[in-house]
Amino acid sequence: MTRVVLAAAYRTPIGVFGGAFKDVPAYDLGATLIEHIIKETGLNPSEIDEVIIGNVLQAGQGQNPARIAAMKGGLPETVPAFTVNKVCGSGLKSIQLAYQSIVTGENDIVLAGGMENMSQSPMLVNNSRFGFKMGHQSMVDSMVYDGLTDVFNQYHMGITAENLAEQYGISREEQDTFAVNSQQKAVRAQQNGEFDSEIVPVSIPQRKGEPIVVTKDEGVRENVSVEKLSRLRPAFKKDGTVTAGNASGINDGAAMMLVMSEDKAKELNIEPLAVLDGFGSHGVDPSIMGIAPVGAVEKALKRSKKELSDIDVFELNEAFAAQSLAVDRELKLPPEKVNVKGGAIALGHPIGASGARVLVTLLHQLNDEVETGLTSLCIGGGQAIAAVVSKYK
């Protein structure tokens, strides 16, 4: 079977809700990475067979945001593109689709990843197409409803985390401690420049003066403590344990990489970072969607012909501390190998981009001692996706 490799994996900094990227459309974040990857590799843009980009909150952006990003990123009109929506798994699903297209011989080079600007998601006025006869009307927050609401139970994703906390007996203190650890790891990594190799700075033009250049993730917080987090009120249930402090944020960002056949990489003298070994997807009861990575990880390992003990580093999306702790318990993961640079609770969770973001961060950790990695994300609606990669040799 054709070996599929990953090269030139990058991401933007992750912006906080209403932060530096509030006026930068998702497709511009994606275009920035596409332009950088082409420049970095020296690849002829016309060599790219297809562009596949995850993006969840598409309303108001225009037709096919992936195509917009591709064109604005400097790719010729002849390169096709399409947009993927598998909620939080969109970015990784895009990479899986690229992988599948290469294995089947349809493509040789695909630009794949994810992008999201949650700050720009519009408010909707449903049932207004043909006017209102009388009475009050309300708006629907497309970010909350299309991105963060379990449609089957009509409640926020945070309730699914509360369900897991109850089912697994995960305390508020355990969740807050997990969140503090995530922040501390991210602070340390950021201060040590450990994200520098994966981040492409984003220049934002201003009406007056020089552009603002964003170089670091905005959500990383110093001086966070369990004591401080314990003062926060529950966000989703009056007597709940999930808070804004032990959940991932609402964020903006993008991540992208080249997915190639090994033969094409050799032909073009592009040095791969890793080999894609296999993927796994899984579904569970939507009310406990956060536990779905357990099944996805097991399937990805089986298809990769690896055991959990073979994995040197894990990048698992931290949707919620309760959700992450439940998955860690089920899989019995070694904590020293999981999210060693911090996770989404600290870095942020731009939903359509996160699947690619966790893989980008993982790829930049591979070396002679860290040779095999696994990444996974839970997905609203009761799903999950996982991937296993190995350092290219």
Swiss-Prot record:
GO molecular function, one term: acetyl-CoA C-acetyltransferase activity
Reactions mediated catalytically: 2 acetyl-CoA = acetoacetyl-CoA + CoA
Domain of life: Bacteria
Pfam families: Thiolase_C, Thiolase_N
Main subcellular localisation: cytoplasm
EC number(s) stated in the UniProt entry for this protein: 2.3.1.9
Assigned protein family: Belongs to the thiolase-like superfamily. Thiolase family.
Protein name listed in UniProt: Probable acetyl-CoA acyltransferase
Organism of this sequence: Staphylococcus aureus (strain COL)
